[in-house]
Structure formats: structure tokens, C-alpha cells
Design a protein with these regions (language model features):
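Short acidic/polar hinge/loop motifs at secondary-structure boundaries
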Residues: 109-136
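Gram-negative outer-membrane beta-barrel transporters
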Residues: 363-370, 441, 446-449, 462-535
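Transmembrane beta-barrel wall of Gram-negative outer-membrane proteins
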Residues: 172-201, 206-240, 252-273, 320-325
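N-terminal Sec signal peptide and the immediately downstream disordered periplasmic leader
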Residues: 2-65, 69-75, 221-223, 595-596
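Structural signature of Gram-negative outer-membrane beta-barrels, strongest in the C-terminal barrel
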Residues: 225, 234, 322-326, 345-448, ...
Length: 597
């Protein structure tokens, strides 16, 4: 009720120096992100049938985020199972789909590990991010192993306007929480470069929850004499962190991830473009876990993992006034080796060759846009899979669209088991409008029918079918008295089968609220709240709304700018966690400064 009253007051109040129609249009188009590529076939948002949310680098700066994990808390339909010390591993869900059902990509390269399909979103620093595209619902017709959706991190490109530009920043918070970053970017003739590096460390806001992470990302770009370009990228994420600590029970992990690519794109003719890339990924991890192995006896387990991916892809795209056709092939050779570091016993030692063929078309017929897509995958370890999808949009007006989408998808939850493939059929109906004066509004109904879900112990594995259906609603207002409001709500009902027993642990209600204030002196304040009803009878505690306050003040000079920022996280010291072992931190404060040149 309070939220409704606030929204009504803001909509009824007179605007402050803004054009209602123009600002509503910007809200609808996403202001610079009107073309989305999360489906692998870039198309206008008004012709995109999938439920996609885009988060830009400006949005990320506003919340003083450290890693991709911090960004997830602010996306409607996404739930973090735990909020911990910056840089430490977290689990998350998308519309109730577990983390091992969601494919996370760095410029189209998967970062999910092979052992259990875990994507370490806390390892990706936000400084390299230009935008993030969240595809909610099966995305297998584009990416293959993406039952619950895809999160595509699109990195920054060289600054085309200057030879040298950059940024340095540092922040400091409680428990010696420190984040230092720098970046350089520019273009000289045909050659462009983007470089960034940083260090994130903390003594731990919770018991045995320390972090010490280093990162580097580099992109070199060369514009070919004709209509094309060549890119080379390398990303290195390295460091250690404490996962949890509860008495004698504790776990620590030390990991390294290196992703390198060489990519090119070339305009063969006016409507035809070819893109190709070579990709290599190397990762290693060492997990140490301590706990009671017998009454009064504390033991230690160690697991060491080495994984690699080597492959490439080639894609052809045809674009004209009537349609956008995309066809391509992916190939990768994957290998994973896991050993018990104490007993020196192999737990996983497997290789596979994976091939995927995909085809997508967006056909524009008047106000309609039809998007049939399909992909065939030969996984090399868990059989072959065909993943079709079909989407349709109908433009009610220039600023309002109706959407429908249905798709089949799958996820490989482990390279270690041949019977590790879980499958889904996703159906969605939605709308998006900017025609209401001063308001952008989006709504989606969804149903995710997932089967062959592995349950039980290794001795007695069973396969279950889960149905999760619900709704998402998002809204944004234009600034009124320099203050704007954003809201998001997600409802999910989970059952075993169509009408079976209630499914515990599915986030039933998720609420996100944000207030943003920006005055003419370049001062900004953001107040964000989030609430998750985990609907779980376990040891969790989630009755509170967690509020974060972010403040920024920018001072402009002739060629540089200085920004001072501060964050108070968990402002009212609330509890919001799924499991008592993974409690969330209490209130903590962080201060920082950023210089752009």
C-alpha cells in the first residue's frame, strides 16, 4: 500500500523541467540499449520476444558495485541465495531456476565450470562491464546449455574519441574491505585498446568469509582497411576467499580463471556479415573443507580441479528491411580433472567434444515480428539435444508491445555424469509500454516445466519434475522533483509436477524498490530495498527488507572529473538469508573516490 501511495503521489505531482513524452520514450528504449544481443541475434528491443533485462555500466556505478554478484540483487526475477563479503562465492536463481541451470557468459564465452556447472559471478569485476543482458527463461536455442536463462556480460570497448583516457578509483570499508581499480582506453588511427585491472580484498564481514582477489582485462582492437575489425581479449581473475565458517565447520577456495579470445567480423556485402572467434579458457581451483568426521574428531578434505575449454565459432548474419537471419556453429573441446588432494584419488577425469549448430530468424510483418529459432547440440558426454523456440511481438503503438515466447531447453549439470542433462519447456506472455504519461511498465507471465531433475544421494538417485509458474512486474517513473522510483515484483509457485505437492525452497515473493535523486550540482542518492520470501521451513531468516543507501558527488574540471562516493549497506541491520550457515552481513559502511581523466 505504501508503495502504491508513493507511486501515485509521484505520478500526480508536477514534473521538474522534463518532457513527459521524451522521458517515457527513453525509459521504454533503455536509452542506448535499444538493440539487445542476449539472444545471439541482435535486434531491437521492440522485436525481442524473450524476457530480457539490460543493466548498463551507469546503473552499476550508481550502486557502487564490486562484482557481478552485487548487480544480481537489483534485477527483477533474480534472487541471490546469500549476500556475503564482496568477492566471495554466491548462489543465485533466475525465476526459481538454480545456478547450475543458468549460463553465464563473458562476451559470449561460458564461465560456468565443468564439474557442476557453477558460474562464479563474484569473480567478474564490474569495471570491465559495459552492460549485462539477462535472458530469463530457456535460452538453449541460442546458447545450448542454458535451461534457466543466460547472463551475457558485454565488456567495454576502446574509447573512439581520444588517444588516452582512463580512470583510477579506490574504496575502503569495514573489516579492511578495499577495492582499487584502474583503466586506460583510447584509439590511435586504426588501433584501439582497453585495459583494466584491480584488487579486491577484505578480512571478511562474517566468520571465515575473507577475500583477496586480483583481476586484469585487456582488449585490443584493429579496424581492417575494408569493412571489418579484429579483436583480441584476455581476462584473468585470480584469488582466494573463505566460503563460510560455523564452529569447526569451514571452507576456503583458491581459484584462477583465464579467458582469451581472438575474434573478427567482416561485412561481406551490404546485408551479409561474417563473425568468427577462437576461444580458450583455463581454470583451476583448490577447495579445502574442514569439519567433524567423527565425534570429537575434526578432519579436512581437499579437492583440486583443473579444467580447460578450447574451441571457436563462426556466424553468418543477414539483415535487411524484412528480416534478420543468423546461422552459426560452435565447437569446443572440454576437459576436467578433479582429485581428492589428500587421498590422491581421481573424482573426475573426462574429456568431450561439443558441437552446436543454430539458426535464428526475425521476420517483420507490419506490426508483427516473428522469431523462430532452433539449435542442435552434440554434447559428447550426455547425448544430443534439439532446442527449438518461437517468439512473436506485436507493436500496439510506437511505445507499447505485446510479447509471446515458448522454448525447449536443457542444462548439463556435470561433466562427470552421462545422465546429468535436465530439461525444460518455457512459456511466456508479456507486455511493455511507455505510453502511460511519466511511467514505463513491463509485465510477464511465465511457466517453466522442468524434468529429469536429479535428486537424492549418489546411492539412490531419483529424477523429478518441477513446475514453476508465476509473474514479474517492473515499473519506472520519470524524475519528479529530481526523484524517480523503480519497482519490481516476482511471484513464483512451485510444485512437484502439474498439481503435486508444494515445492519448498522456491522464492515465492521477491520485491525490489529503488528511489533515485539527482540534482543539478551532480549529487546523486540511491536508496534500494529488496525482500525475498524463500518459502523454506529450514534454518533461514528472511522477514526483513534489506536497504542500501548509495551517495555520489561529482566535481567537473576542464579535462578531468573527481567523484566521491559512499555506501551504507543493510542500513537497518536486517536479516535476509536462506541458511543459517550463510548469514548476511549486518550494516557496513564504505567510502571511496574515483577520478576520470
Amino acid at each position: 500500500m505504501l508503495l502504491g501511495c508513493t507511486l501515485s503521489m509521484m505520478l500526480c505531482a508536477p514534473p521538474a523541467n522534463c518532457d513527459d513524452d521524451l522521458r517515457s520514450l527513453e525509459l521504454y528504449n533503455g536509452e542506448g540499449t535499444e538493440v539487445v544481443s542476449g539472444t545471439r541475434s541482435p535486434r531491437p528491443a521492440s522485436q525481442t520476444a524473450e524476457n530480457i533485462t539490460v543493466v548498463t555500466s551507469q546503473d552499476i556505478d550508481a550502486i557502487n558495485a564490486h562484482t557481478l554478484a552485487d548487480v544480481l540483487s537489483y534485477v527483477t526475477g533474480v534472487q541471490l541465495e546469500m549476500t556475503r563479503t564482496p568477492g566471495t562465492p554466491v548462489n543465485f536463481e533466475v525465476q526459481g531456476s538454480n545456478f547450475n541451470h543458468v549460463l553465464v557468459l563473458l562476451d559470449g564465452v561460458p564461465i560456468n565450470n565443468l564439474a557442476d556447472n557453477f558460474p562464479d559471478v563474484s569473480s567478474i569485476p564490474v569495471q570491465l562491464i559495459e552492460r549485462v543482458e539477462f535472458v530469463k527463461g530457456a535460452a538453449s536455442s541460442s546458447w545450448g546449455n542454458a535451461l534457466g536463462g543466460g547472463i551475457n556480460v558485454i565488456t567495454k570497448s576502446p574509447d573512439p574519441e581520444r588517444a588516452v583516457g582512463g580512470m583510477v578509483s579506490a574504496s575502503y570499508g569495514e573489516r579492511e574491505t578495499f577495492d582499487a581499480r584502474a583503466e586506460l582506453s583510447g584509439t590511435i588511427n586504426r588501433f584501439g585498446y582497453y585495459l583494466t585491472g584491480g584488487k579486491l580484498r577484505s578480512d571478511g564481514l562474517l566468520s571465515n568469509n575473507m577475500s583477496d582477489k586480483n583481476n586484469f582485462y585487456g582488449k585490443l582492437q584493429y579496424d581492417l582497411p575494408a569493412r571489418g575489425s579484429l579483436n583480441m581479449t584476455t581476462a584473468v581473475m585470480d584469488g582466494e576467499s573463505g566460503m563460510f565458517g560455523a564452529g569447526v565447520n569451514r571452507a576456503n577456495i583458491d581459484s584462477t580463471l583465464v579467458v582469451s579470445t581472438i575474434a573478427t567480423q567482416y561485412q561481406l556485402m551490404d546485408h551479409l556479415r561474417v563473425e568468427a572467434a577462437l576461444v580458450t579458457t583455463e581454470s583451476s581451483a583448490k577447495l579445502l573443507r574442514q569439519g567433524l568426521v567423527a565425534p570429537g574428531t575434526v578432519g579436512t578434505m581437499a579437492f583440486e580441479t583443473e579444467e580447460s575449454r578450447l574451441g571457436g565459432n563462426i556466424q553468418l548474419s543477414w539483415l535487411d528491411d524484412l528480416q534478420r537471419i543468423t546461422a552459426g556453429i560452435d565447437y569446443e573441446h572440454v576437459s576436467a580433472h578433479m582429485v581428492n588432494g589428500i587421498a590422491l584419488v581421481d573424482l573426475l577425469n573426462r574429456r568431450a567434444d561439443r558441437v552446436g549448430l543454430y539458426l535464428s530468424d526475425t521476420l517483420t510483418l507490419g506490426r508483427f515480428a516473428l522469431t523462430p529459432s532452433a539449435r542442435f547440440d552434440s554434447t559428447g558426454s550426455a547425448g544430443d539435444h534439439f532446442s527449438p523456440s518461437f517468439g512473436v511481438t506485436y507493436a500496439l503503438t510506437e511505445n507499447s508491445v505485446l510479447r509471446g515466447y515458448t522454448a525447449r531447453g536443457y542444462s548439463l549439470t556435470s561433466l562427470n555424469r552421462s545422465a546429468s542433462t535436465e530439461k525444460v519447456w518455457t512459456s511466456q506472455l508479456g507486455f511493455e509500454t511507455g505510453d502511460i504519461p511519466g511511467l514505463w511498465l513491463k509485465g510477464t507471465l511465465f511457466r517453466n516445466d522442468t524434468w529429469d531433475i536429479i535428486s537424492g544421494s549418489t546411492r539412490a538417485i531419483t529424477y523429478e519434475r518441477h513446475v514453476k509458474q508465476g509473474a514479474e512486474v517492473e515499473a519506472k517513473t520519470i524524475p519528479v522533483y529530481r526523484t524517480s522510483l523503480t519497482t519490481g515484483y516476482t511471484y513464483i509457485r512451485g510444485t512437484h509436477g502439474d498439481s503435486g505437492p508444494h515445492l519448498n525452497g522456491v522464492p515465492k515473493h521477491t520485491v525490489q524498490v529503488g528511489l533515485r535523486y539527482q540534482d543539478y550540482s551532480a549529487f546523486q542518492a540511491h536508496l534500494n530495498g529488496r525482500f525475498i520470501d524463500w518459502d523454506n521451513p529450514g534454518t533461514g531468516k528472511y522477514g526483513a527488507i534489506i536497504w542500501d543507501l548509495h551517495l555520489r558527488k561529482t566535481v567537473e574540471f576542464s579535462e578531468t572529473s573527481l567523484e566521491i562516493f559512499a555506501s551504507v549497506r543493510n542500513l537497518f541491520n536486517g536479516d535476509q538469508y536462506l541458511d543459517a550457515v550463510y548469514r548476511n552481513p549486518g550494516r557496513w559502511v564504505e567510502l571511496g573516490v574515483r577520478c576520470n581523466f
